[in-house]
Amino acid sequence: MTERVQVGGLQVAKVLFDFVNNEAIPGTGVSADTFWTGAEAVINDLAPKNKALLAKRDELQAKIDGWHQARAGQAHDAVAYKAFLEEIGYLLPEAEDFQAGTQNVDDEIARMAGPQLVVPVMNARFALNASNARWGSLYDALYGTDVISEEGGAEKGKGYNKVRGDKVIAFARAFLDEAAPLESGSHVDATSYSVKNGALVVALKNGSETGLKNAGQFLAFQGDAAKPQAVLLKHNGLHFEIQIDPSSPVGQTDAAGVKDVLMEAALTTIMDCEDSVAAVDADDKVVIYRNWLGLMKGDLAEEVSKGGSTFTRTMNPDRVYTRADGSELTLHGRSLLFVRNVGHLMTNDAILDKDGNEVPEGIQDGLFTSLIAIHDLNGNTSRKNSRTGSVYIVKPKMHGPEEAAFTNELFGRVEDVLGLPRNTLKVGIMDEERRTTVNLKACIKAAKDRVVFINTGFLDRTGDEIHTSMEAGAVVRKGAMKSEKWIGAYENNNVDVGLATGLQGKAQIGKGMWAMPDLMAAMLEQKIGHPLAGANTAWVPSPTAATLHALHYHKVDVFARQAELAKRTPASVDDILTIPLAPNTNWTAEEIKNEVDNNAQGILGYVVRWIDQGVGCSKVPDINDVGLMEDRATLRISSQLLANWLRHGVISQEQVVESLKRMAVVVDRQNASDPSYRPMAPNFDDNVAFQAALELVVEGTRQPNGYTEPVLHRRRREFKAKNGL
């Protein structure tokens, strides 16, 4: 039983109450009485509104299900369907024109374009690595990944391989020639870098000296001007640093003594309380809030063991340089942090309201993450986050403008409780639910003075696409979904609406995750599509990926690209409403088996770690042993696709069970080296994780909007109770 403290009409878990009063509040200038009294009023006033919004979701879904059921066996009538969606208030009239009015936004969001990380804030090590991923070694990112081929004697090996190292150096020199070209000659032939008379001077192997074609790209240096340790350059708004140390192992092999190129990489990071964490009770929530507090105060630290030694990882300090005129230049040493709160769906028993009901978790997150961020606003931190006095909160899984307006109201109420100026709390709107996509302009308008981010999350969005049209028929296979008409229109619509509502210069227009952290050569080839599509940020799965994805923002001037895209014909809502139904379901038995096995394996690989270990985001080997980043969004697609095929008779429940059992053996094998792993086979009936996976598919049509959280939370609590955790 959870030990609770009565606070007014609220029953607060003691572990949360003690954390808030003893750790979070001191230093904020907010008294405990003021906070809890205000929190109770917010909960009492807004929890019923939250509940009503969820009822509206269910009501609309039931009407859509009924419409499709009444037309079973008939060809889909797109015109009648659209009229029906308008009639029931799902598709609303387009909002009148407006421009976003957000103020006090940090440059990383408003004026720069670059990679964005998303990490589970529940894991302090991941959180620190991401915070420090603002700057990343290009040499390490190239040497340690498949971007550099291992052919021709360039294997990674255990020690330093000079053949591979030379390929890395050649790649980096080519980057320098592209991003900071010389007036004459090439960085390939550089023999030294120095600063003379306020300019960068590059000596070449033919004995001549040259400078940058655009002298303004040189900003500053570290060390002695005649023999600098680092030279700071800027291109397309992003910084990078040529690091020089002729005595280092790599510098010894380089004609100019260059040991690395340090890239400005993850400009922003989302510290996630949502899809990448497994937090089901007060104890879990306090872990999340405590880590967020450490980030906001700048004192988060974690003991890390690597290569037989242990050290303490902390947040990096700012970077300090000397300008050409001798003055000091300081650059932000860390990624600018957002925090992603949970959406409107779930409740959490960390707090019970006056009637003994669990309080909506999104309201709790809004109150606690904002309270904690006051430490940064007050300067009660050794590692400043926002320089403009803002708190950046990503709000996921909102369905339509009413829900965006509710978030705006919640944030206003939280500001009042905490004594913050209006619109201090900024909002990032995840465009990952269909009703938000088709009404995106109205959603942005509902938070037009807070919006700092819109982002397409195609994974969740696909899950909602399947669930919304669950009764329409069998959908295409998962691999075919990306080439369906709706998805291209959805991605373009996000950019079109963002530009039309004046987000450029005020907010990020973002794109989704590269989910294969080991396949960096493919990422380097393909993910340039995101900046070309007009996104000034896109998600990457690791600091290394952030360093490599930064290269794309040197190849594409995103703000110029946005200006071009603003002139195109906007995406069509009719295209967005095109349901991804399979033209026929005459797949071969082998094709069906492969699809079921692939999804079953992905579901199990993720769910078993979620339920048994409380891991909400991990690299899960797929059926071909390719590591894929999985979180609840990928789980939503896989479970909804199988539920859809089950609903329409493409597969049977027996096939699902048989595949899950077979794939459980595969997942057990893939996790055999993990000493804390508990095998699912052969005791399937008594294995909580296996039963959770089965329930997600078999009961998939009945899950609210296809979300996986209700099953996962209940089953994780069951596992914790069963094992005394």
From Swiss-Prot:
One GO biological process term: glyoxylate catabolic process
Modification Cysteine sulfenic acid (-SOH), positions: C617
Residues given in the record as glyoxylate binding sites: R340, E432, G457, F458, L459, D460
Record field: catalytic activity: glyoxylate + acetyl-CoA + H2O = (S)-malate + CoA + H(+)
Class of enzymatic activity (EC top level): transferase
Residues at which Mg(2+) binds: E432, D460
Protein name, per record: Malate synthase G
Gene it is expressed from: glcB
Family: Belongs to the malate synthase family. GlcB subfamily.
Amino-acid positions noted as binding acetyl-CoA in the UniProt annotation, renumbered to this chain: V118, R125, F126, S276, R313, P541
Function: Involved in the glycolate utilization. Catalyzes the condensation and subsequent hydrolysis of acetyl-coenzyme A (acetyl-CoA) and glyoxylate to form malate and CoA.
Subunit structure: Monomer.
Location of the active site: R340, D631
Protein location: Cytoplasm
Keywords assigned: Cytoplasm, Glyoxylate bypass, Magnesium, Metal-binding, Oxidation, Transferase, Tricarboxylic acid cycle
EC assignment: 2.3.3.9
Main location per the UniProt record: cytoplasm
Gene Ontology cellular-component terms listed: cytosol
Cofactor: Mg(2+)
Known pathway: Carbohydrate metabolism; glyoxylate cycle; (S)-malate from isocitrate: step 2/2
Gene Ontology molecular functions: magnesium ion binding; malate synthase activity
Organism, scientific name: Pseudomonas aeruginosa (strain ATCC 15692 / DSM 22644 / CIP 104116 / JCM 14847 / LMG 12228 / 1C / PRS 101 / PAO1)
